[in-house]
Amino acid sequence: MSLFHHLVSRFLSLWLLIFLVFLVLSLGKSQKEALQVKVGIVLGSNVTLADLSLRAINMSLSEFYNTHNGFKTRIVLNVRDSKQTVVGAAASALYLIKKREVVAIIGPGTSMQAPFLINLGNQSKVPIISFSATSPLLDSLRSPYFIRATHDDSSQVQAISAIIESFRWREVVPIYVDNEFGEGILPNLVDAFQEINVRIRYRSAISLHYSDDQIKKELYKLMTMPTRVFIVHMLPDLGSRLFSIAKEIDMLSKGYVWIVTNGIADLMSIMGESSLVNMHGVLGVKTYFAKSKELLHLEARWQKRFGGEELNNFACWAYDAATALAMSVEEIRHVNMSFNTTKEDTSRDDIGTDLDELGVALSGPKLLDALSTVSFKGVAGRFQLKNGKLEATTFKIINIEESGERTVGFWKSKVGLVKSLRVDKVSHSSRRLRPIIWPGDTIFVPKGWEFPTNAKKLRIAVPKKDGFNNFVEVTKDENTNVPTVTGFCIDVFNTVMSQMPYAVSYEYIPFDTPDGKPRGSYDEMVYNVFLGEFDGAVGDTTILANRSHYVDFALPYSETGIVFLVPVKDGKEKGEWVFLKPLTKELWLVTAASFLYIGIMVWIFEYQADEEFREQMIIDKISSVFYFSFSTLFFAHRRPSESFFTRVLVVVWCFVLLILTQSYTATLTSMLTVQELRPTVRHMDDLRKSGVNIGYQTGSFTFERLKQMRFDESRLKTYNSPEEMRELFLHKSSNGGIDAAFDEVAYIKLFMAKYCSEYSIIEPTFKADGFGFAFPLGSPLVSDISRQILNITEGDAMKAIENKWFLGEKHCLDSTTSDSPIQLDHHSFEALFLIVFVVSVILLLLMLASRGYQERQHNASPNLPNDQANAAQEEVNEEGNVGDHIVEVDTALVRRKKLTSNTIPIRRVAPLSRLKSA
């Protein structure tokens, strides 16, 4: 054993040396056996972004092959300098394809260099993989061999749009670099802002070759505009210059809003501290990478290897692009990686170019398929191409401060703005973002629109009208052709502007043609304000929902409502049956039935109490009862009733008749004396059924309202002035005129001031918001003007203006009528009739109870013999002298043998003295 241990210890170092030599030889053999695949890189030298990206590519391939040692392919990089020019990039790519026969190219670094490389790759079937060419315009080339291993700029447009919408800014100005990169985002911005009704007032293009003075001149131009929301889309080198000059001329002060795209926000790490100071208060939209395990490990390795150089988003995309290419190359390792070169006829020197003998990569289609389907979890998130590019789902909203950037929220696809990624509900309010420090070091949200003090005069459009000139009238001097604008609306606007807290210069521009005719409808005038031809519109412009999509209206300054106006007719022709009109048909029937009911109840009560009534013939009974019942109407009963119950019922019934007759008399008097004039038509439905012609003002929105109410379009007539309306009314529908007019209250009042007693307003009154001044969406003038309108309407200024233009119309407001005088119906007297019915039923029950009681008392007394009854009858002989009274005895009881000496039923007692005097 000792000998064995001695040999092992002696030759251990030798055995280890032999093993290491064997391992190195094996690795060298495997490396030599791996397929060398040439890949080109076209990036600019001496550029921080390109340098960081190239480091990331080398680091990605090194770590990938160390992890996947058994792969049969190895990418060999061929790096060419683009010289930061389009021509340099094109020459580099042509060299790599033609001379080096690379199977793929990573690059170029900018969107401007990409178009030629894309066409070159498409022709040679060499995939062009770019991690930094983000312009959406490159998609228009429609080359399948262009792989965008990054997001295009259109993906952030929705995030920018959400910010604008959340703060309710209505106008923006994009400031962009004047090249393919800057212009590429504009179509997407326009579409996104149109969806939320945000207007792009101006597009500011700044060339890379502009001097500082030229940039300053452009910024001064922006200062003269009212818009204060700017969206900056450019790279950091030009962006730093822009913000430095903007800071110098005080455009980063209170009231301004600056938003930068990810062209600057993603590269904040390579910008100096001075740039951050100049951008204090700026908002940024930055690409968001989740802090995955892969990203954290890469950042640690990056810091260890390169020290203070920060890993940015483009370096992450470059890292993932190299990994994806290595995986795809390994997948097609069995494919021929050579080029198929076709000789061209170059015998003529004048047609020979560098594109001659440009080969076609045999591996191109297979490599393209592999790249399109590769999927893995990279450092920048899931690497999976869709339509040849990566898709962005989340952006980070940052607030730039002097010390760096601060996250204030996020934008998530299909969710919107959120304060935290843990919140999945869409935010429609800026409060869902964290507090923001705005330019000027303020936390108050800028309005986004200010009236510049050095601006030119506002161009205020006024309508050209052929009538109703009390509201707006445009006249032109025959010699100078200078327009003069007057009217109620103009005086209101002038008064409002004179009370504004700041001076506003404006001029009236008639909305007419060169020959002085109206240029179009009010809708067209409002739409031209939206298009920017005018800075506002003043006149009798009604506030409508469809118009509010294009302009902002100040508060209304006129009365509201739309009504029908019809002629009135003489109400003295009442007809022969006017006396029936105070009561409705139902009330007449109820009253007649009540008389019949009262008669029946009287019959019942009197039948039990009146012997004379019982002895009458049936026809006499009926006539007596109903005569008695109806005579109560005039309180003229011929004879008193014999029944206590009848008397009570008659008292209640007379009370009801008193109220009924008094109400009838009052209503009939009103019909015969008060109502002298009545509208020819009482309701809109009657107009629709009658099919008469209806007038409306030319160019008014009331035409659409009439069509919506299903009025026949062929029956609608137009008028331009009160005089034309009057003329149409005189002709009537039968002669091509009108029998009704549909217009706003303000115009109807003006017409009624002249013809108050001849026309009337009928129901219903339709809602409208009145007249308002129109301004561009988001205009700060709207709130200030609305405040001044409230001030003058609450004071005496508005009354003075109204008296100036509409004096004498106020008394006509009472001519508005409703239907004919209200008839009395049975509902008004339900309680009285119910009282009569209840009282009658109670009396009937009392009568029946009393009769039953008497019957029981009588049955309890013994009956007299016949002879006693006869004796009693002879004794009294129908009339007895009781003291000094003559007594009339009920003979019926005597005949029924129910009369005793103790009980003598007396029907009527009369003093003897009265009979003697008679």
Swiss-Prot record:
CDD domains, per the entry: GluR_Plant, PBP1_GABAb_receptor_plant
Signal peptide as annotated in the record: 1-30
Positions bearing carbohydrate: 46, 58, 122, 336, 340, 546, 791
TM segment ranges: 587-607, 617-637, 648-668, 829-849
SUPFAM superfamilies cross-referenced by the UniProt entry: Periplasmic binding protein-like I (SSF53822), Periplasmic binding protein-like II (SSF53850)
Positions of region (Disordered): 857-881
Cytoplasmic topological segments: 608-616, 638-647, 850-918
Keyword Transmembrane belongs to the record: yes
Extracellular membrane side: 31-586, 669-828
Keywords: Glycoprotein, Ion channel, Ion transport, Ligand-gated ion channel, Membrane, Receptor, Signal, Transmembrane, Transmembrane helix, Transport
One GO term (biological process): calcium-mediated signaling
Membrane topology listed for this record: Multi-pass membrane protein
Recorded GO MF terms: calcium channel activity; G protein-coupled receptor activity; glutamate receptor activity; ligand-gated monoatomic ion channel activity
Subcellular location: Membrane
Cross-referenced Pfam families: ANF_receptor (PF01094), Lig_chan (PF00060), Lig_chan-Glu_bd (PF10613)
InterPro entries cross-referenced by the UniProt entry: ANF_lig-bd_rcpt, GABAb_receptor_plant_PBP1, Glu/Gly-bd, GPCR_3, Ionotropic_Glu_rcpt, Iontro_rcpt_C, Iontropic_Glu_rcpt_pln, Peripla_BP_I
Major site of localization recorded for this protein: membrane
Record's compositionally biased regions (Low complexity): 866-881
Tissue specificity annotation: Expressed predominantly in roots.
Gene Ontology annotations for the cellular component aspect, listed alphabetically: plasma membrane
Record function comment: Glutamate-gated receptor that probably acts as a non-selective cation channel. May be involved in light-signal transduction and calcium homeostasis via the regulation of calcium influx into cells.
Family: Belongs to the glutamate-gated ion channel (TC 1.A.10.1) family.
Subunit structure: May form heteromers.
Name the UniProt record assigns to this protein: Glutamate receptor 2.5
Source organism (scientific name): Arabidopsis thaliana (Mouse-ear cress)
Phylogenetic classification of the source organism: Eukaryota, Viridiplantae, Streptophyta, Embryophyta, Tracheophyta
